[in-house]
Design a protein with these regions (language model features):
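Helix-coil boundary/capping segments in enzymes
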Residues: 1-144
Length: 144
């Protein structure tokens, strides 16, 4: 099924697409590696902070207050710090998934293409797409 930009603009329900009909998420097939004829630098990429981002990076006296990812009873994953829960928003990491599954709903790391949050997988994805470098913007962890 093909969805055009006009379809998306006329019906914003796609932002709550969520899971595939089979119950999990669908990842599109890996693209073929692109030949690089000239240098391409992506100037507007977004990355999700990996779950271990803050481990060992704060002074010892603040380590117990560092943001961390926990798994909740319902199986979802969320960032926790300073008494707040901040979920990973699925729309931050829709790369490699069909538009019908785009969602603002919380997402687990295993529901994201690894290149959305793992630097080595990100570089491999950039190589596949012929991207030499990119400017990355963080997701949403207020205060950091």
């Amino acid at each position: 099924m093909s969805i055009s930009l006009d379809d998306l603009a006329s019906n914003m329900n796609f932002t709550t697409g969520g899971k595939s009909k089979a119950g999990g998420v669908t990842f599109l097939p890996e693209p073929e590696r692109r030949k690089r004829d000239y240098t391409i630098i992506s100037a507007d990429d977004h990355i999700v902070e990996p779950p271990h981002t803050f481990e060992g990076r704060l002074p010892a006296k603040l380590a117990d207050r560092a943001p961390k990812v926990i798994e909740k009873e319902d199986g979802s994953e969320t960032w926790v710090y300073d008494g707040m829960e901040i979920p990973n928003v699925g729309f931050n990491a829709v790369v490699g998934r069909p538009v019908s599954e785009y969602s603002f709903e919380p997402a687990r790391f295993d529901e994201m293409r690894r290149g959305a949050w793992d630097i080595n997988a990100r570089v491999a994805d950039m190589d596949l797409n012929g991207i030499y470098a990119s400017v990355n913007f963080p997701s949403f962890l207020p205060g950091f």
